[in-house]
A protein has these predicted regions:
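A mobile, often basic/glycine-rich helix-loop segment
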Residues: 110-140
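Short, polar/flexible loop-turn hinges at active-site or ligand-entry regions and domain interfaces
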Residues: 75-79, 125-129, 285-289
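Short beta-strand segments
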Residues: 1-3, 26-29, 55-57, 102-105, ...
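Short acidic/histidine-rich active-site segments
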Residues: 98-114
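Residue-level signal for inorganic ion chemistry
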Residues: 46, 104, 272
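A conserved beta-strand->alpha-helix junction
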Residues: 24, 38-73, 92, 212-224
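ATP-dependent adenylation/pyrophosphate-handling site
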Residues: 1-52
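Adenosyl-5′-phosphate
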Residues: 51, 82, 91, 95-100, ...
Length: 419
């Protein structure tokens, strides 16, 4: 799979040297959302190495049509919209007779390739580290009064952190780790609004009256790291947590299940155990230096891949889920969330869910990632737990969704048109 970024280009460059025939490369793009595309960069790399290049361009309709298949093959709820383009590019590969593909998962974790790593590092170094050294009662007071925002500096709270600022201050007061890995969708403060009062009471009762928190998962992995390597710095902690949580439970699970749904196998050369062992012993200062992410990987690949690839800004493999939710997917969200059998279990506060749906519809707040997670959970529950024949979206709900879109448009509730 080729994006034209450093990881996939390195794969193609090395494979080209070892193969007597052209490497087959595959790229996916979005018809109505070119800002997400890396088609031009992939084509340029394909020309550079003379690959047998293939492309697939998908639309929002392709998303709607493929959702039942994705829910079926994932087996469990999955909150990652990248499954959609991944399924289509996997099918493209299969159509060419390909049975095994090389992918770039693992490189960002091993060599500090994520923008969030840098953002969390800046937040840690410019305030968090100093605040965590204060006595508990002072940290609690700072968090409760909002002084934490002043101490950390509003400008230092990158977009994701601004959104989860209440939970960051809660973590500060409780002495919890700043970074919990990228595998979590809902933070603890958000969950206190999302779950119904009855659910929160049941969870507390099962946990001896104490609040049940996802931090228990983070804490156990972190304690294991610090027992083996007490000198681990902040970047090493973040990388370790992602290797233990996000990579295996989200990224590798995603790529394995979705590619196998198309009857192909994905292999991850960056996760060769010898390379992982080597990379984990590289000092943090060689992974992130002078504002350069993946510093040592860039140095190692100089002269092996084109300079323009090394210099281009990382885009990342994404999907225009926010834009799609401002269009026809918005009607599907409205229909499926509030008509799912899951609603009858009273796990969630659907008044709160209605609020975030309305915020998304009006374009006030980008709640797309949260809503995508809830949509997938609802569809998964209906299919696998309730045993409903196929999914309602695939078996007759389209007319209801179209009607809902038309109603919302006539109601003039702001935001983009949902058609």
């Amino acid at each position: 799979f080729l994006s034209g970024g450093i990881d996939s280009t390195a794969n193609v460059a090395l494979m080209s040297r070892m193969m007597s025939e052209p490497v087959k490369t595959f790229t996916v793009g979005f018809r109505d959302n070119p800002v997400y595309n890396e088609l031009d960069e992939a084509r340029q790399v394909a020309r550079e190495y003379g690959t047998d290049h293939h492309e697939v361009i998908i639309s929002q309709q392709d998303l709607l049509d493929s959702l039942p298949e994705i829910i079926f093959h994932q087996d469990e709820p999955n909150a990652d919209p990248v499954c959609v383009p991944l399924l289509h590019v996997s099918k493209l590969a299969k159509e060419t007779g390909t049975t095994v593909v090389q992918v770039g998962e693992g490189s960002d974790e091993l060599f500090c390739g994520y923008r969030d790593y840098v953002s969390y590092l800046n937040l840690y170094n410019r305030g968090w580290r100093q605040l965590t050294g204060l006595p508990h009662f002072i940290r609690k007071a700072i968090s409760a009064t909002g002084l934490g925002a002043f101490q950390l500096g509003a400008g230092q709270l990158f977009p994701k952190a601004r959104k989860m600022a209440p939970d960051l201050f809660r973590r500060l007061a409780q002495g919890e780790e700043l970074f919990w890995s990228g595998a979590f969708v809902f933070d603890e403060v958000y969950k206190s609004h999302l779950f119904s009062a009855a659910t929160l009471e049941r969870l507390a009762a099962r946990n001896s009256g104490r609040r049940l928190s996802s931090y228990s998962v983070v804490q156990s992995d972190l304690e294991r790291l610090l027992a083996a390597r007490p000198e681990a710095d902040q970047l090493q902690r973040m990388i370790y947590l992602d290797l233990k949580l996000r990579l295996p439970e989200l990224l590798l699970m995603r790529v394995d299940k979705v590619t196998m749904a198309a009857s192909i196998e994905a292999r991850v050369p960056f996760l060769d155990h010898k390379l992982v062992e080597f990379a984990m012993n590289i000092p943090s200062g060689l992974k992130y230096r002078n504002g350069q992410k993946k510093y040592i990987l860039h140095r190692a690949l100089q002269g092996h891949i084109p300079d323009w690839v090394l210099k281009r800004k990382k885009k990342g493999f994404g999907a225009p889920i926010n834009e799609w939710m401002l269009q026809r997917l918005g009607g599907m969200i409205d229909h499926e969330l509030f008509n799912s059998s899951l609603r009858g279990r009273q796990l969630f506060d659907y008044g709160f869910i209605r609020q975030i749906v309305e915020q998304q519809r009006r374009g006030q707040v980008n709640n797309s990632f949260f809503l995508w997670a809830l949509l997938n959970l609802s569809l998964w529950y209906d299919h696998w737990i309730e045993g409903q024949p196929s999914l309602s979206w695939a078996s007759g709900a389209r007319a209801a969704v179209d009607e809902e879109n038309a109603r919302l448009q006539l109601a003039g509730q702001g935001g983009s048109r949902l058609v």
